[in-house]
Amino acid sequence: ALSWYLKDPRDVYYVKSPKSFLGASGLHEIQISFFEDLVCAMMANIKQQAEKSTQATITDAMIGKPINFNGLGGEAANKQAERILINAAKRAGFKQVLFEFEPVAAGLEYESTLTKDQTVLVVDIGGGTTDCSLIQMGPSYRGKTDRASTL
């Protein structure tokens, strides 16, 4: 894809990390639709492969999300990105779509080893985002569905 793009950038869409664009400011509806189509195709493929592997219908999706999708757009960028992900997941066949902050998801395994509450620095380096978060973790936080207040 990169070599095609370099030959003629006017004729090819080249997106290295789609998630990093989901919260971009100034996107037109056609661009938002393009990203939704792209994410939907990826989710549908993953869903199909998982259903084939498990021989079961999968109706729920838990999606990791960075604390902020795009530093410049603030909460509007986060809402735009979440809307794209929800629409794509529903179109891919998921009935229930839930989100978890990526640094929380990254720290959950470690939290299961803690015997007392403490503040933990979780560094989550992904394909398009990096989150460094101080998170309250430990026995009294386990099982809480909303961890936003612990960040």
Which functions belong to the PLM regions below?
Residues 1-12, 18, 56, 63, ...:
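Oxyanion-binding/catalytic loops of NTP- or PPi-dependent enzymes
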Residues 1, 5, 26-29, 33:
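A near-ubiquitous, low-amplitude feature marking generic local secondary-structure context
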Residues 28-48:
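Adenine-nucleotide phosphate-binding core of ATP-dependent small-molecule kinases
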Residues 47-61:
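Phosphate/pyrophosphate-binding loops at sites that engage ATP/ADP/AMP, CoA/4′-phosphopantetheine
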Residues 43-51, 108-111:
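Generic structural signal for well-ordered alpha-helical scaffold segments
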